[in-house]
Every structure is written in C-alpha cells, then in structure tokens.
Amino acid sequence: MKKNWTLLLVSCTLLLAITACNLPGLLQTPAPPEPTPTPDFGMVWYQGAGMQILLPDTYEQRDAKQDLGGILNTLEQFVGGQDSPIASLTDNLESNVAWWGEDTAAPAVYPTQLLIVKNQALEGVPISLIKSAVKLVLGSDTGSLQTETLTFGPREVTRFTYGKESTGWSAYVFKEQGLLWVVLFITPPANLAAQQDNFDYSVASMIIAPTATPQS
C-alpha cells in the first residue's frame, strides 16, 4: 500500500513539473491577425503590378502595353509636359504602370478612368515640391485645384482635386515600399463630388506588396 502511495506521489510531482514548464506558453496571448479590408457591397479586389485595390465591380482592367499613348495623355493632365519638374513620372511607363482601366458603368462619352503609376526615381522628392509642380502645370487654372492631406491608417496621402469645364481628376500621391505612388481618377467635374468618397475608399483599401530585397 505504501508503495502505491509513493508511486502516486511521484506521478503527481512529475505532472506538476511538466505543467509548470508549459505554463508560460499556455498563458501567452496569441498575436492578433493582420486586419484585411472587407469589401463593401459591390466592391471587389482588383490585382495590379505590386498592388491590389478595392473598386466597384463595374471596373474593367485594360492592357496598359496596348494603350501607352492614351496613358501618357492621361498622366500629362496631372504631370504636364517634358519641362515639368516631375516629368520623369512618365518615364518607363510600360514597367511603371501598376493598373489601368475604366468604369464600364459610366457613359462611354465621359468614362471614369483609373491610372495607378509607381515610380522609384521620384520617391525622394518632397511632396511639397510635387504640389508646386502641379500648380506650375495648371498655371492660371490653379484656382480650380484643391489640395488636402488625408490619413488612411498608417498611410498619409496628398489628394489633388481639379475640375474645370469638361476636365476633372482626383490624384492621390503617397510613398510606400520605396516608391512614389500616384492614383489618378479621371472623370468629368460634375462627377467628382459624387464619386469622391468611393475614390477615397479605394485608395484607403490599397495593399502594396513589399519590394524584393536586392541580392548582394
């Protein structure tokens, strides 16, 4: 009988020792999962080069390589010509266009287009200089330009909004993963106010893929 009690005591001691060793791990709070934006009704994920974005499901991606001329014309509304301080934003478009397409629900005569461009050369340029460059491009039409700094989580974005006569656009500029990003929505001025919240939502939803570390 005494032998049985001794064995039971030894077993309990071993069990307590094992439990004590594992206790820190059991008490550890698991790391919360990384939040992923949940699409609102009618919004879907679109994949681009090094990024993804939530847009209305009526958007349709186009082949940027087949439409470089149209992309250049679109981008020059924001950048200006080759004498602009930020003209290098139009360089290497074939590799720097991250997404290009349009909203098929908009009238064909005045489509809403979306162009997303990334650029490494301009990543070090201060946003203040980009603001000055945009004003320089617009010249006497600067009065039709509105500039605002927005914060979407950890992302600080400068939004340029321009509308005059039949020309309108909202451009979102920010820096992430060693690149300057420009998200440019082209739409008639009458549509800017109605779509602004959707544009903001889409830019806030963007997920930028980490850039690969160069191999030494």
Residue ranges and their predicted role:
Residues 2-96, 100, 148-152, 165-166, ...:
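N-terminal targeting sequences that direct proteins away from the cytosol to non-cytosolic compartments
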Residues 101-102, 106, 110-177:
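Signature of long, low-cysteine stretches enriched in small and polar/charged residues
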Residues 159, 181-184:
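Structural recognition of the beta-strand scaffold that forms the well-ordered cores
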Residues 118-120, 184-187:
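Short, histidine-centered active-site or binding-site loop motifs used for metal coordination
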